[in-house]
Amino acid sequence: MPMSSFKRKIKAIQIKIASPDVIRSWSGGEVKKPETINYRTFKPERDGLFCERIFGPVKDYECACGKYKGKKYEGTVCERCGVRVESREARRKRMGHIELAAPAVHIWYLESIPSVLGTLLNMNVSDLENIIYYGSRRVIERAFIVTDPKDTPFAQGDIIYETEYRIYRKKWDFEVEQAFIVKNPRSPVLSDIDGEVILRTEKTVTGREITWIIVRNVNRAEHTVLPGMIITVKDGQEVEKGQDLTREMNVDPLYAPFDGHVEIDEISNTITVKPLTTSKDQPVVFTVPYGARVLVSNGQKVKKGDQLTTSTTLPAVKASISGRVKFGSNLNVRALEDGNFEVLSSGNVYIEQVIEERKYPVFEGALVYVNNGDQVKKGDHLADRFLFEEEYLSSTEYKIFESHYPTMFDVEERTENDRPIVVITDIDPEVSKETGLKMGDIITENEYEAYLQIYPEKIVADAGAQAIKKLLQNLDLEELRAELEAELKKLPASSSKAMKLRRRLKMVKDFIKSGNKPEWMVLEVVPVIPPDLRPMIQIEGGRFATTDLNELYRRLINRNNRLRKLLELGAPEIILRNEKRMLQEAVDALIHNGSDSEGKRSRRAVLKDRNGRPLKSLTDLLKGKKGRFRRNLLGKRVDYSGRAVIVVGPHLKIHQCGIPKKMAMELFKPFVLAKLLGEGSTSKTMRKVKKAIIEKEMPEAWEVLEEVIKGSVVLLNRAPTLHRMSIQAFEPKLVEGNAIQLHPVVCPPFNADFDGDQMAVHVPLSAAAQAEARFLMLSRYNIISPAHGKPISLPTQDIIIGSYYLTTVGKDFDSLKEEDIRWRFSSPEEAMLAYHLGYIKLHTPILIKVSIKGEEKRIKTTLGRVIFNSILPEDLRDYNRIFDKKQINALVYETFKRYGIDRAADLLDDVKDLGFHYATVSGLTLSLKDLKIPPERDEILKRTWEKVRIIEENYERGFLTEEQRKSEIIRLWMNVTEEITELTSKTLAEDPFNPIYMMVNSGARGNIDQVKQLAGIRGLMIKAYDPRSREIKSKIFKGQAIHEALTFDYPVDKNLREGVDILQFFISTYGARKGQVDTAMNTSFAGYLTRRLVDVAQSVTVTEPDCGTHEGIRAMDLIKDGTVVEKMNEFLFGRVLASDVLDPETKEVLKNPETGKEYTRNTMLTDDDANFLASYKKMVDVVKYDEIDITELSLPNMYAEIAEPVGEYKEGTELTWDVVKAARNEGKYRIKVKMYPVVGTVYANEQPLYDKKGERELLVYQEVINEVVAKLLEENGVEKVLVRPDIIVRSPLTCESEYGVCAACYGMDLSNHKIVNVGEAVGIVAAQSIGEPGTQLTMRTFHVGGVMGASDIVSGLTTVEKTFEPYAFLREEKSGGKKEIRKYYGSEAVLCEVDGFVKDIATDETGRTVIYIEDYAGGIHAYRIPKRAKVKVKKGQKVLRGDTLTTGAIVWWKLLELESEKGVLTAMNLLKIIKNAYVQQGVSIHDKHFEIIFRQMLSMALVIDPGDSDYLPDQLVPLVDIKRTNREILEGNARVEENRKWVIGKMLAKRVITETDDGELVELAQKGEEVTEELLKKFIEAGIKEIDVVEKDRVVTYQILPKEPIKYKRRLLSLKKAALNYPGWLSAAAFEETAWVLTAAAIEGKVDPLIGLKENVIVGQLIPAGTGLDVFAGIQVEETPRAAAEEKLA
């Protein structure tokens, strides 16, 4: 026989950051090409994204080229195509990889909040992004121009910016001037005057050239000078009018210098003496002086010494005007030694008198249009410009141009530039000391170049992902950890810097602990997921549709290949940078193609397809409803299922359902086939024949089908599956037609009706699954709801009306006397005969003999009642009762309690059959005439309108305000509506058989509110509103909050039978539409609430029978704002006692006199027990005097004090064993005592107990009386008090099980009224129990057409949300400079911190109300009340610790701080609020479900002082972990001495670092060093508390100094936060914020121990609950041979 057993294979799952080597190890090869498949052959391209060599063959067991085909070649690698022969399934598993040409940062670690990279490197995220994406920094700074480079590598005129200048200045000596940047120079340069041009050039201080264009307008005087004259002035010299230009001089005659002949040139006025041909002399030329006469003739011979000219006198030339001397261009002069000039030939000397002159400096590079000496007119162009735009001028140059061109150009002293930035990745320690720079500092590229010039090869900086990688590689985590810990010790714990450091320290510790290397956050290799997870499919028309991922991978590969090529070519840095940035963006898009709208800091553009749809990245594949977690891992499609419309199956038993034949054949096809084949041959031909038998629906097939489904069960499910009763098992019955038939009684749990609802059918396949479905899920065994322990599968509508009709009587029945009754019968059978013969009717009064509790009695009743009672268990029969909905429900519940689930199920079937039959017999119809309008109605309306008229008159006269007028009118109409409702009900009740009255009164359909609208009055209507508006003021009317601002003060005074007018119809539309809108808007919200609840509680299962705790919670009535939300009997039901319940008077264990049951610890309380305990009250003495015998070995079983002094103990001391010992020492054997029997009991009178004066409350309802209160009672002369026992019950809130809860603390499994089984998934049940009504309530519109006063579900849901998300509704608002916490509803409630009395309520000098509380000791505590809050207490009232003194919302963390560590007071307050919201909607949910959720919300604690644990202050840690850590610390402290001996001689596994008093890090020992006694002593002196040593090739940690335990505070988390802080990362990631949860878990190397249910569903194994528990794992299920054959075929 085949066996099957369910062993759980996976114990835990760890997540870590993948190293490049790990990614490569996953891979089947590198993807080098972006191609996917060949467009002609449709085969994958080699080395492409679908390559068969990398990812596996496309065809099963066939290589790409077809050389190897078939399974026999499995594992062979084809030498031709390189493809390994294997199953095509490999393409779902095998991965590839892309080797990146440049590293790229993993965006999750950059963009997470807080950023992991930013925290670890202590860098700003914006700076990090700038580095990674090769960004720049905007710098506004001055510039300088080098004027004297001295011995530096600068050139004169080089521009240096301020940042660089500061760097160079520290090391080099050179001169600079500040630079000015030219802006908007006007051009061209125009002459302002007429005149002559003079051009001059000169060099500036920066070595650049300036051309001076000088334009002069001059008066010029010409003076001729003659040869021989001596000019006494210099060119350019200033002279005065009349000043000599040449001096007067006598000119000697000229003589021949040698023999020869003369030549006279009259034109040039010269005499040339030429020597004789025989002579060696050269010819000599003489200029004839002005005024001399030539004495020789042309050609004349002369002798040496002959006179050639006469002597003469040259007169002086005088200046005719004042001005500047200018030598003419024709003037030929010779400079003399005395500085004068001799005129060699006639010429001109000019004197220029400047009338006007303009200078135009022009910078080098400008085009000059004029030449020297040119004459220009005013307005002529001199040059194209004088300066260039953006030209840098030194301050000297700037002054020149500023003085010559004022207002013709602007300058900027500072320049604004975007400078590329780099991060320092390595720096010489000396340079670091000198410059103050360190690794990780960001500088601009200019600064880096400056540092490089000064410190060549001593500083390295870079940008991009490679820079981040270097920084991460350079981190020494151990050293960083020691540094951070040392720095934290110096800072105040609450400072923001300390918080930042703590966050960083946690990350460092996480990296150390997990063994992850920080540089792995920068990718060198990108994994390529298997191709079958990113398929490409051919669509109509031959085109291909591909997954977005392929497009993202393609883009990445293209950019990667392009960058690699550019690197090989040695492309310029700027091109490479751009390409690297694009590669980084491609990797980003692949991992997370996110957008800013998702709350990310992303500066990236989102990649979109041609239709503008963002491409789905790997992150999108994981997160959200359609992500991998929620869609594929937590929700799976199920085979062997069908779906069809449901119809009612009145003939079915409760555990049966009707399945259409066709559907059943399809569902059970493999089983039918197996059965058919089991009878004959299994050959292929035979198989085809048998298949044809099924497909052609031959008679044999139906016979086999009938046989197959016998004994099987199927699961029926109706969406939405809100709780476990939405899936139940039924025995299938084959039916004709196409609809599934459903038993009408199981409609309520499914929330099904027959207006077109559909249901799904599932077939459990294995014998184990069938057994589980039958015994655990059969509808017969799921009648009782696990939410409240009462029946949920109940008769409705027709069945109710049938039963009601059967048991109702005429209105005269009760007044009818026995003697007046005509029909008398000796037995029910006789009566039935009379009925069938037509003598009597169902409702005819009869006298009949029936058996009641074994006795024959004659009773007055009707045949209908006899018929109905005949189906009931004998001791539950009641012949004088009308059985309406409530009565039938109570009957089913009582039957279940007394006789068990089977009898209850049978009763339901019987009631169903009876109900349907007699509903048909009743012939129920509905007509207008059945709507009876009360005759008094018109008179009442007339009277009311008159009153309204008087109110309006008073308003118009000014006697009433607008608010008062509205309030009065609303109150008036509310009263009238109520009065007419009562009258309508009475009018209908006159005829007990009125169809409408029967429907409403029986509870079958509708309610009196609807009848009131049909036949009475519609009443006031409500307006639409925002339920969270702060403006809503509500008033209480008959226990109901009425929002006056939201109510029309004009009523609809008509009813629907007579019809409404247009205005009234219009008014009605508001509320009617509001109902529809609320339903639509809030359904999703309620679903989200359920989802959060499930996520929080899913791991809570019953893990052990008893945790052994003695803690518990006090049983009480839950009272909120004076309204009883839950009575104590409901509170007690299903609980287990935490301690014995003692009789208040005798102090002995309480016993139920009826059942004899004793209420000791660990007793489970049933309904009857709860009722008994809740009603048990006694009058007990406050004080009793007695004399006790102290020779007995027991003390009184109540609080007692000595009534006489004993030794050193005074009168009034509590009686203890120490007092008894002292008395015995004195030789006493009896002591007088005063006993207080009331101490330890609970005050049970709902009216407070006052003091003698009647001013102060001494006791309030449900107060536990302690000795202080007892003495107060005694002082005030109170002798007896009505009390009840103090009952402490166990609760999930106080359970001490490490994981989940124990069976004793959970108590009763409400679905079967037995103690809960170990393994029960109580968390899921709790979440479903709370969430299901929330969803249901939104889907039913509770507003009856928007009529005022109907309960409003939205406000209920808001309350639920406020309770489960306590901090989401807190708003810190600044008002008047102060921070105030406000809510949607008012302000913060003031909490009382002591037990005491309200002494006084007064107003202080600022006008604020102050409440003074006097405690028991007489101390006064003052509470100032916020302006918006209203006082809830009154003078003399008793208040207890944790009570609210004012209106407003409770700030939960304040309440938590008021109480003990348990958080019970907080939970009970939350419970009151939330129960109230549900109770108002008529929904019953047991408290334990809320307690489980609150337990999870209170499961985290805030670390105040981490002691010597690895936690950080302000870190949220599971309470379980803290308690475990503290336990381990205390155990470790006990082993310190032993450990010190043990470590001697062992080798250190890590180096040991500590910090000195100066703040320097010191290495105490190196890795591998042996631990000696001296070294150990050194460790202890340095305060090292634990060391890691190597022991048998393992690293073991030993504690060598005592550690401090953790100090903490309990914290209340919201549902969302509790779900995200769940210890298992798989469940948290599947909930919300997937990327961040996975990021944080990977850094930590988090291990998910698979404790919860979700995690196990995700990994695909049985959940650790129910039959999935390890206890059941070894059970082997034997299956029948038939089932085995079916299994094989299936």
UniProtKB/Swiss-Prot annotation:
On whether Metal-binding is a keyword of this UniProt record, the answer is yes
Q: What is its EC number?
A: 2.7.7.6
Cofactor(s) listed in the protein's UniProt record: Mg(2+); Zn(2+)
How and how many cofactors are bound, per the record note? Binds 1 Mg(2+) ion per subunit.
Q: Provide the reaction this enzyme catalyses.
A: RNA(n) + a ribonucleoside 5'-triphosphate = RNA(n+1) + diphosphate
Supply the InterPro entries for this chain. Answer: DNA-dir_RpoC_beta_prime (IPR045867), DNA-dir_RpoC_beta_prime_bact (IPR012754), RNA_pol_asu (IPR000722), RNA_pol_N (IPR006592), RNA_pol_Rpb1_1 (IPR007080), RNA_pol_Rpb1_3 (IPR007066), RNA_pol_Rpb1_3_sf (IPR042102), RNA_pol_Rpb1_4 (IPR007083)
Q: What class of enzyme is it?
A: transferase
A single GO CC term for this protein reads: DNA-directed RNA polymerase complex
Keywords associated with the record: DNA-directed RNA polymerase, Magnesium, Metal-binding, Nucleotidyltransferase, Transcription, Transferase, Zinc
GO MF annotation, one? DNA-directed RNA polymerase activity
The record's section on Pfam families has: RNA_pol_Rpb1_1 (PF04997), RNA_pol_Rpb1_2 (PF00623), RNA_pol_Rpb1_3 (PF04983), RNA_pol_Rpb1_4 (PF05000), RNA_pol_Rpb1_5 (PF04998)
Per UniProt, Mg(2+) binds at 753, 755, 757
Record-stated family: Belongs to the RNA polymerase beta' chain family.
Q: What does this protein do?
A: DNA-dependent RNA polymerase catalyzes the transcription of DNA into RNA using the four ribonucleoside triphosphates as substrates.
- Complexes and interactors: The RNAP catalytic core consists of 2 alpha, 1 beta, 1 beta' and 1 omega subunit. When a sigma factor is associated with the core the holoenzyme is formed, which can initiate transcription.
The protein's name? DNA-directed RNA polymerase subunit beta'
Native source species: Thermotoga neapolitana (strain ATCC 49049 / DSM 4359 / NBRC 107923 / NS-E)
